[in-house]
From Swiss-Prot:
Keywords: Cell membrane, Membrane, Transmembrane, Transmembrane helix. It is a multi-pass membrane protein. GO terms for cellular component: plasma membrane. This is UPF0295 protein BPUM_0828. It comes from Bacillus pumilus (strain SAFR-032). Belongs to the UPF0295 family. The keyword Transmembrane applies.
Length: 115
């Protein structure tokens, strides 16, 4: 079985990685001290990456406030569900709000709209 995690945690992990990538890009800019334009380019690119992570964190925070809160039957802790199927943030139990999907194997494709 593939390794799944909750959607909120995936997006938060992406935003955190943008912060570290931004710092790495700015660190690369330090090696180009002789060229002011190249150094400035890398510094601005790093700041842009960190700024983008702030936007992503804000977006997932707003999305998180609208998520449905449920109590996980596996660990008895409160967790948030985005979409039709999601994973528990604590124990990674598959969760669904759709009665038609109860008992079925977990698949993230259930959240995609059919064309």
């Amino acid at each position: 079985m593939a390794k799944y995690s909750s959607k909120i945690n995936k997006i938060r992990t992406f935003a955190l990685s943008l912060v570290f990538v931004g710092f790495l890009i700015m660190y690369i800019g330090v090696f180009f001290k002789e060229s002011i334009w190249l150094s400035t380019f890398f510094m601005l690119l790093g700041v842009l990456s960190i700024g983008l992570s702030t936007v992503v964190y804000f977006w997932i925070g707003m999305l998180s406030t609208k998520a449905v809160r449920v109590v996980c039957p596996g660990c008895e802790k409160e967790t948030k569900v985005l979409g039709r199927v999601d994973m528990c943030m604590h124990c990674r139990e598959p969760l669904t709000l759709d009665p038609g999907l109860e008992g079925k194997e977990f698949d993230e494709s259930y959240n995609r709209k059919k064309s």
